[in-house]
Amino acid sequence: MPTIQQLIRTERKTLKTKTKSPALRGCPERRGVCTRVYTSTPKKPNSALRKVARVRLTSGFEVTAYIGGIGHNLQEHSVVLLRGGRVKDLPGVRYHIVRGSLDTAGVKDRRQSRSKYGAKSPKE
């Protein structure tokens, strides 16, 4: 613990927190273009084929983003909107693609949690 004299001489350094989504540059979302759409396998206890895309952002970064929901219409050169949020069992995937905006279609026949997947209200 420093003495009062030491604190007068040099003030305490403020701790800088590292951002978990540096490619967004402090913005809530970023636009980008898909350079590659593929599937990836998750870490050890889980087993699946997770849908991911490599995206070049307007901020100049190229990142890997997760495509949530069942089925998607993305291919190379699709324009997508990216938000933060990692996928715990996919190393290096720190972003999510926003469903139902730009070239990304919403999930078909989705009835619950529709706003998260860009699905319209079901007609009855």
Curated annotation (Swiss-Prot):
Organism taxonomic ancestry: Bacteria, Bacillati, Cyanobacteriota, Cyanophyceae, Synechococcales
Protein name as catalogued: Small ribosomal subunit protein uS12
Leader peptide range in chain numbering: none
UniProt record, GO biological process: translation
Pfam families xref list: Ribosom_S12_S23 (PF00164)
Source organism (scientific name): Prochlorococcus marinus (strain NATL2A)
Function: With S4 and S5 plays an important role in translational accuracy.
A GO MF term: tRNA binding
Binding partners and assembly: Part of the 30S ribosomal subunit. Contacts proteins S8 and S17. May interact with IF1 in the 30S initiation complex.
InterPro entries the record matches: NA-bd_OB-fold, Ribosomal_uS12, Ribosomal_uS12_bac
Residues that bear 3-methylthioaspartic acid: 89
Any single Gene Ontology cellular-component annotation: small ribosomal subunit
Keywords associated with the record: Methylation, Ribonucleoprotein, Ribosomal protein, RNA-binding, rRNA-binding, tRNA-binding
Family (UniProt): Belongs to the universal ribosomal protein uS12 family.
Region described as Disordered: 103-124
